[in-house]
Amino acid sequence: MTMELTGNELIKSKLIDIPERSGVYRMFDANKQVIYVGKAKNLKKRLTNYIKTDLDTKTLRMVANTCSLEYSITNSEVEALLLEAQLIKKFQPKFNILLKDDKSFPFIKLRLDHDFPQLLKYRGRALNDGKFFGPFASATEVNTTLSELQKIFKLRSCTDNYFNSRTRPCLQYEIKRCYAPCVGKINKKDYAELVGQVKDFLQGRSKELQENLSKKMEELSEQMRFEEAAEIRDRIKALSYVQLKAGITDIVKDADIIAIVEKNGHYCVEVFLYRIGQACGNIPYFPTSTENSTKEEVLKHFLLQFYQKQQVPPGIIINHEIDDKDNIIEAIRNINDFAKLSITIPASGGKLKLVQNAQENALFSLEQYLKKFAKNQELMFEVKELFNLPEIPERIEVYDNSHIQGKFAVGVMIVAGKSGFDKKEYRVFSLSSRDSITGSSKSTNNDSISCFLDTVDKPRYDTKGDDYEMLRQVLTRRLTRLKQEPHRLPSLMIIDGGKGHLGIVKEVMNKLQMDIPFVCMSKGPDRNAGLEQFHMVGREVFTLNKNLPLMKYLQILRDEAHNFAIKNHRLSRSRAIKVSSLDEIEGIGDTRKKALLHYFGSYKAVSDATLDELSKVKGISKSLAKMIFNALHKN
C-alpha cells in the first residue's frame, strides 16, 4: 500500500502537469475541505514558490495541511481574479484573507407601484421595482432618515392591506405623521407633489426644493391661507435641519472612501459612503487570516470581496497603493456590470482630508477591536484550562431551547469565538411536538442575524414538552450536519442543562460516533445566577466564583442562547396564534379567511372589527359574523 503524498511533495508531483497559464488553484485538507484559493498569472511559477524552504509560518502550515490540489485555467488575469473572489466567497477557506461581515448595505426605497407611494427600508442587490436612494452604512442611518422624512413629508407608512382596510384615519394622522390618503384626506395630485419633493431631497436637490417651497409659502400667504403657509414654513425649517445634520459636501459626489490601517498583524478597513455629496455613514471591517499579509494584499482582497456584495460608485478613493490596479478595476466592473469606475489615491486637497479622516477612524476602530480581541483571547485561554481542552477554542457552540409545555418548541445554537459572537452562524431548529406548530422557523431580527432552519434529512420525534427529547433532536440534527461540514466542528459545546442532559449528549455522540468536548451548565440548587454548576464526563460537578471574569463570560454565552431561544419561540408562537385564531372557528375555511384578511388587512384589524364591520365582508353572514366576533373576544 503506497503512502498518499501531502504538502510540498504533493505539489512537486503535480508541477510537471501544471501549465504556464493564468488561472486559479485550490488546496484541500485531509477532510477534502478547501483551505486556500489562489490566483496566478502563471500557475506553474506560482505553485513552484510553495516548494521553497524560506516560506513564512502561515504558508508552511497551509502547505503542510494540503492533501490534494486542483486548478482551473482562465483566459485572462481578470477572469482569474473574478473566479478567485467567487471561490473565496463560496468556500471561506481558512488560510485566505476573508471579509467575514458581508451583509449588503440598506437603501431607502420609494415604491412606484401604488397611487399613494410609500418609503421603505430595503436591503439587497436587486434594485428594481422602485426608486432607490443610498446605500447607507447601517439600518440605524436608514431608520433615522425615514423617521425624519416621515415627520417632514407625512407620506404613508402602512402596508397595502392595512391601507385598503381603513374606514377612518389611524393614529399616524392624529399625531400629524401622515396625511391619511387611505380615507381621502389628501388627493392624488397633492400627494404626488409631496412624492416629488421627497425625490428632490433624496437626490440632493435640496437647494432647489427649498427655493420652490419658499415661493409656494409666499403664494399661500398672499392668498391668506396662513395655516398651509405655516406648514410649508415648518417643512423648510425641518429640511434645513436635516441637511445640516447630514453633512453635505461638494468635495465628492458619489464615492466610497476606504482606508486601511494595521497594528500587530491585525487590520481594519474603514469604509465611508458618500452619495450625491452626502455622507451616508461609515463602517469598519476586520478581515481575518491576515497573518504575514501586507496592506496591499489585504486591501486588494477586501475590494474584490466587498464589491461582490455592495453597489459600486463611480469613484473609490483609497489611502494605500495596490498593484495590478487596472485588473482589479476591470474585475469589479465585471462583477457589477458597471461602465465607469476609478480607484485613486489623493495627494492633496479636500479628498486627502476625507481619506485622512477615514484613516483616523480606522485606527480608532482597530484599537477598540484589539482591546476586545485581547480580552477574548485571555478568556479563551481560561476556557481551555477550565475544561481541559487540547487547544485554545476557535469556535464555541451554545445550545438552549424554549417552549410552553411542549408547544411552539424551538431549539437554538449560538456561536462565539476569539472575535466575539458570530451571528451569521446562529441556527434555529424547529422541533416536533404533537401540539406545536412545526415547520421552518427562519428568524429575522433587528441585527439582521443570518439564521435558518437546519435542513438535514432526519427522523422526527414527538418531544411532548420533554427537554431531553428536544436536546436529543437538536443534537442529532446538528451532529449529522457536522459530519458533512467538518470545517465547522466546534472546539467546545455548552448545553444549558444538568446531569440528565449530560447523559443525552453522551448517548447522541456515541450513536453518531462523534467526539467533541462538551459541558452542561445548570443554574444550581436555587436557580440563581452566580451559583451555576458545571457537569462534565469523568469529573465531579463543580462551580466557579461568581465574580471571576470567566464566570461572567460563560453567563453571557448562556444568556445569549437563552434570549435567542425565547425570541424565536415567541415568533413561532405568534405565527401559530395568528393562524389558529381564525382556523379554529367553525365555518371559516381558507376562502373566508382570505376574504377577511383582504378586507381588514391584518389579523389585529379582524380582532378589532365590530359585528357590523365583520358582516360587510363578502361571504360572511350576520350569524357567522357573530360567531367570529364571539370566538375572537371569548377571553
UniProtKB/Swiss-Prot annotation:
Main location: cytoplasm
Subunit structure: Interacts with UvrB in an incision complex.
Family to which this protein belongs: Belongs to the UvrC family.
CDD domains with a match to the protein in the record: GIY-YIG_UvrC_Cho
One cellular-component annotation, GO: cytoplasm
Presence of the UniProt keyword Ion transport in the record: no
Stretches assigned to the UVR domain: 207-242
The keyword DNA repair is annotated on this UniProt entry: yes
Keyword entries, A-Z: Cytoplasm, DNA damage, DNA excision, DNA repair, Excision nuclease, SOS response
Superkingdom in the source lineage: Bacteria
Role, per record: The UvrABC repair system catalyzes the recognition and processing of DNA lesions. UvrC both incises the 5' and 3' sides of the lesion. The N-terminal half is responsible for the 3' incision and the C-terminal half is responsible for the 5' incision.
Domain GIY-YIG, residue spans: 20-97
GO biological process: nucleotide-excision repair; SOS response
MF GO annotations: DNA binding; excinuclease ABC activity
Entry's localization field: Cytoplasm
InterPro entries given in the database record: GIY-YIG_endonuc, GIY-YIG_endonuc_sf, GIY-YIG_UvrC_Cho, Hlx-hairpin-Hlx_DNA-bd_motif, RPE4, RuvA_2-like, UVR_dom, UVR_dom_sf
Name by which UniProt lists this protein: UvrABC system protein C
